[in-house]
Design a protein with these regions (language model features):
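Conserved SAM/SAH cofactor-binding pocket of Class I
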Residues: 92, 96-192, 197
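Conserved Class I SAM-dependent methyltransferase catalytic core
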Residues: 210-273
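Residue-level signal for inorganic ion chemistry
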Residues: 26, 64, 94, 122, ...
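Short helix-capping segments at alpha-helix termini
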Residues: 16-17, 130-132, 153-158, 226-227, ...
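Conserved AdoMet
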Residues: 25-103
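Active-site beta-alpha loop architecture of Rossmann-like, nucleotide-cofactor-dependent enzymes
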Residues: 68, 186-189, 240
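Mobile active-site "lid"/loop adjacent to the S-adenosyl-L-methionine
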Residues: 185-215
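Non-catalytic nucleic-acid substrate-recognition regions in nucleic-acid-modifying enzymes
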Residues: 1-22
Length: 275
């Protein structure tokens, strides 16, 4: 039987910065262990059925399927979340949205809305950090709502709920001190949609018209009806869209408009306060 070390050395994945790490995650998953097990027991022999499972995982990855979809989970903030192909994979850059939200409101009671929640990543991270906040996450995809609810139940979070809604459509009369969203913001003609992991992600969670701003425009237009006085709206957007989003916020009647940079130095999150 092959050893852990042999299988990792023999793993053939497309050359990329994450190829070695991808193989480790996939073998650990096939074994039902953590990646530290691989380093602790490199000479451990692997059962044939485990080797076959690992080979199947590798083939899916060679075809470009994201590791998160193969494993059915993804880390975000301090959380381990279930993911599925009908939801966007949570990304590290989106943690900036969480950090910004935590800075905007005090730790006391507040009603907070997460639009287009997907896996529930943003709402769940905020619920973890602010036990007094009452979080609502909405998504138009019923499967995403079910998945987000499963994540909340598994994490034991009682201060968050998830409901099906196309943006604000199911929230008549509801007002919040803070609204956050990582909406679709990729241009329909963007060639990156045909490359890498995004080929496997739902286009409805990625694409927003010819300039990538259709959903952001709608959210900024409708948010004042659902914000309390002096409430905040925080939006993630593309690396080159900050100026356009700030202009939309100013034109929408928001004040204290500004942007923050992500890990790569790009303005990735913009926000404003309702006058």
């Amino acid at each position: 039987m092959a050893t852990i070390d042999y299988l990792l050395r023999a793993a053939q994945l497309p050359d990329s910065p994450s190829a070695k790490l991808d193989a480790e995650w996939l073998l650990a998953a096939a074994l039902g262990k953590g990646t530290s097990y691989l380093r602790t027991w490199p000479d451990c022999e692997v059962l044939p059925e485990v080797e076959a499972r690992f080979a199947a995982y590798l083939e899916r990855r060679r075809l470009g399927e994201p590791v998160a979809y193969i494993l059915g989970r993804q880390g975000f903030w301090s959380l381990d979340l279930e993911v599925a192909p009908h939801t966007l994979i949570p990304r590290p850059d989106t943690e900036l949205l969480v950090e910004t939200a935590l800075d905007m409101l005090p730790a006391g009671p507040a009603d907070v809305l997460d639009l287009g929640t997907g896996t529930g990543a943003i709402a769940l991270a905020l619920a973890t950090e602010r036990s007094a906040w009452r979080l609502t996450g909405v998504d138009r995809i019923s499967e995403a709502v079910s998945l987000a609810n499963r994540n909340a139940q598994r994490l034991g979070l009682g201060n968050v709920r998830f409901i099906e809604s196309l943006w604000f459509s199911s929230l008549a009369g509801q007002r919040y001190g803070l609204i956050v969203s990582n909406p679709p913001y990729i241009r329909a003609s963007d060639p990156h949609l045909l490359q890498g992991d995004v080929r496997f992600e739902p286009s409805s969670a990625l694409v927003a018209g010819e300039d990538g701003l259709d959903d952001i425009r709608l959210i900024i237009e409708q948010a004042p009806t659902h914000l309390l006085s002096s409430g905040w709206l925080i939006l993630e957007h593309g690396y080159d869209q900050a100026m356009a989003v700030r202009t939309l916020l100013f034109d929408g009647g928001f004040v204290d408009v500004a942007s923050r940079k992500d890990f790569g130095g790009h303005e990735r999150v913009s926000f404003g306060r309702l006058r």
